[in-house]
């Protein structure tokens, strides 16, 4: 019996030793691939330059999703498109042009939010400043037809609120301005009688205060001042309204113009100079509803197939640019990590899921759908590695004390990739479990108590990257990527995801949240 036990123990030792040796060989192979055959920038190139900006409901989003499926299949992963929801109409953005004709002639630098109207071909017209009172509207109503109208405020990327709630707010402000005018008449009479110089009350402003009336009068479009770099989001009211159909879409363009050009044009209008603006904006809609899907690829676990490690990013991106950073920095390294793992012959003990979420920019829609559909899996997720930030490389992690030893062991090979790139595991204190969604897909999982420990990143080479410059702006381009950072990120992601998947036990959640 003793001899049999010794033989069994020896076999177990050999088996475990062989498995450990095999995994070490896989990690070395991943590092080699990362150095000699790293294709992360190819993935980002296709995603951002061949497909471009890709909001849900667009052809670009659907085409990018199909491309991801094709790539994953070619690498040997299991992959599927999983329906996550639908949107009432679709939207495809074409090119846009504009110019000032006359004195101070110049090309115009502008954007329009997604899901807003384009022009009816090339349209040219004079320019007016929007009215603030009934009297001002009456004075100019005969000139509104065929005019471009400058509206108040500074753009935050959204169009004028054309909803019933927006109409209600505008009606309220109009009434308040009527009362202000009455009080100003009293102030005028008082000043005239007494010789005092009591200041008049300021009228309240609201972008597009006479929006409905101006649309009915036949304006060509609205123009609002916007800080540079220009930011353009989407028509949230249209997308979220269940009553939206192809037949009730707003038909007047909503233009966000470079603040410096806006100031010049506004001054020219105030000085009553003669000039025109010309725009050609090719924004196109699709009949809906349009379904959108999460792209889910997987490497099935060899020992714990019903336990999971998630690597994720979001596939959708605003189309004012091409989503080179937001979220090319998530999708590119995720795809390349999957390719590296397959090419290196990885056979993880746990299933690794590679998830490209839909609709993050419209409110984490794909992540919410995944959590709802797969609620039974939430307790079996070791960690979610979600990347949705800049191109900076991983330089460490903050983890609960109960995970510290595991992550120190898992990440030990990371320092072999590039000695000039630091990587350190540090202990973090328990935090309150979030109760509301934040700005990323990871927040949806965190609310459910799932570990969403991400990498600490840093611009260690000092390449002067500024996330705010690209965040939902015209500069979110492929060229804003830093190739060496992205290549390192893909390699680190592959190694760490595999390491977590190969632990003998699921990562402890002790000390993760204060319950």
Where are these regions (language model features)?
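Soluble metallo-hydrolase cores and metallopeptidase-like ectodomains found primarily
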Residues: 24-26, 107-109, 113-139, 240-324, ...
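N-terminal hydrophobic or amphipathic helices/low-complexity stretches enriched
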Residues: 20-63, 70, 78, 299-303, ...
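Bacterial N-terminal signal peptides
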Residues: 8-16
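Metal-dependent peptidase/peptidase-like ectodomains
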Residues: 103-107, 145-146, 156-157, 252-254, ...
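Noncatalytic luminal/extracellular "stalk/propeptide" segments of secretory-pathway proteins
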Residues: 45, 49, 53-186
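Zn-dependent metallopeptidase/amidohydrolase metal-coordination segment
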Residues: 206, 433-489
């Amino acid at each position: 019996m003793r001899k049999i036990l010794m033989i069994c123990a020896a076999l177990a030792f050999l088996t475990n030793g062989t498995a450990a040796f095999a995994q070490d060989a896989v990690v070395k192979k991943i590092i080699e691939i990362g150095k000699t055959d790293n294709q992360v920038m190819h993935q980002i190139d296709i995603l951002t330059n061949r497909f471009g900006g890709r909001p849900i409901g667009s052809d670009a989003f659907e085409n990018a999703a199909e491309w991801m499926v094709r790539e994953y299949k070619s690498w040997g992963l299991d992959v599927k498109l999983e329906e996550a929801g639908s949107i009432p109409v679709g939207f495809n953005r074409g090119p846009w042009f504009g110019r000032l004709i006359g004195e101070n002639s110049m090309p115009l630098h502008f954007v329009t939010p997604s899901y807003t109207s384009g022009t009816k071909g090339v349209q040219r017209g004079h320019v007016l400043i929007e009215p603030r009172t009934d009297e001002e509207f009456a004075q100019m109503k005969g000139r509104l037809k065929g005019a471009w109208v400058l509206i108040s405020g500074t753009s935050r990327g959204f169009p004028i609120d054309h909803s019933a709630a927006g109409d209600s707010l505008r009606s309220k402000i109009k009434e308040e301005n009527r009362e202000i005018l009455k009080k100003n008449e009293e102030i005028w009479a008082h000043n005239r009688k007494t010789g005092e110089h009591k200041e008049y009350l300021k009228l309240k402003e609201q972008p597009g205060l006479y929006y409905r009336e101006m649309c009915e009068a036949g304006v060509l479009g609205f123009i609002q001042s916007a800080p540079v770099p220009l930011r353009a989001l989407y028509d949230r009211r249209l997308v979220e309204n269940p009553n939206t159909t192809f037949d009730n879409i707003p038909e007047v363009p909503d233009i966000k113009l470079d603040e410096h050009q806006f100031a010049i044009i506004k001054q020219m209008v105030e000085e009553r100079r003669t000039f025109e603006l010309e725009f050609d904006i090719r924004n196109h809609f699709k009949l809906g509803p349009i379904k959108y899907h999460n792209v889910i690829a997987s490497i099935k676990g060899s020992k714990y197939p019903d336990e999971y490690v998630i690597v994720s990013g979001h596939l959708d991106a605003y189309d004012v640019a091409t989503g080179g950073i937001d979220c090319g920095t998530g999708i590119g390294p995720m795809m390349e990590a999957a390719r590296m793992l397959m090419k290196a012959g990885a056979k993880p003990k746990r299933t690794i899921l590679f998830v490209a979420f839909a609709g993050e920019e419209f409110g984490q829609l794909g992540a919410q759908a995944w959590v709802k559909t797969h609620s039974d899996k939430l307790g079996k997720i070791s960690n979610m590695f979600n990347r949705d930030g800049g191109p900076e490389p991983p330089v460490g992690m903050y983890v609960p004390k109960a995970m510290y030893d595991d992550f120190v062991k898992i990440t030990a090979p990371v320092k072999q990739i590039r000695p000039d790139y630091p990587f350190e595991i540090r202990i973090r204190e328990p935090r309150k479990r979030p109760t509301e969604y934040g700005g990323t897909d990871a927040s949806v999982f965190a609310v459910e108590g799932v570990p969403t420990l991400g990498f600490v990143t840093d611009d260690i080479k000092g390449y002067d990257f500024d996330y705010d410059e690209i965040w939902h702006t015209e500069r979110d381009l492929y060229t804003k990527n830093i190739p060496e950072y992205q290549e390192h990120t893909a390699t680190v992601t592959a190694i760490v995801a595999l390491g977590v998947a190969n632990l003998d036990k699921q990562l402890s959640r002790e000390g993760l949240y204060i319950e």
